[in-house]
């Protein structure tokens, strides 16, 4: 029921911006677990998927960046909901400003265990083997893994901000900015904390928080970028 309440809040927020937004960018981890079989997708998320479809039917671009909980998005969201899928970081210009958008997993993180897991999750061979398991068991396994991942966090939240000299995404961004000084805004998900940090006179890095605990999002009005909350 808690998850259903969070979903309704997110859907109500998307409904409130459908006549104002020219594009919506979802930076990953929108699902606890998502895996597409050839003819089967996980049950649930009905209201959310319906709202995405409504937005795209209205002509609003919806961009979906795969996160580490929804790595295995196939073509269902694009074919059925009209969503544009991104599996890598995107650099794009919006109203004259340069944006670097990414989920953020694997960027600047030296953790060898995480790198191994990420390689396994992206392995087409392992995905083929996983697809051979009946969804009755494979989806249950995926949901159990996601639940275990959540329960490792304190109060269901990610560790607090570690400071700009320790936060992997900030360190990665600083290094990337050296060779791409024209980028104005770096925006990430993944860490599930709220952060808005100036890196130079013309560049900022934002981590968006999430839609489970913070109900946070960024909005760009053509001139300025704001980190806000819809609850």
Language model regions located:
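N-terminal short leaders/motifs
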Residues: 32-55, 152-183
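Hydrophobic positions within alpha-helical membrane elements
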Residues: 34, 72-73, 108, 139, ...
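Conserved catalytic motifs of the protein kinase core domain
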Residues: 23, 97, 203
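Active-site-proximal loop/helix segment associated with metal-binding centers of metalloenzymes
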Residues: 104-168
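Core catalytic region of metal-dependent phosphoesterases/phosphodiesterases
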Residues: 2-94
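Low-complexity, flexible helical/coil segments
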Residues: 24-31, 59-65, 99-103, 121-129, ...
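Conserved beta-sheet core of the metallophosphoesterase superfamily
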Residues: 82-87, 100, 105, 109-117, ...
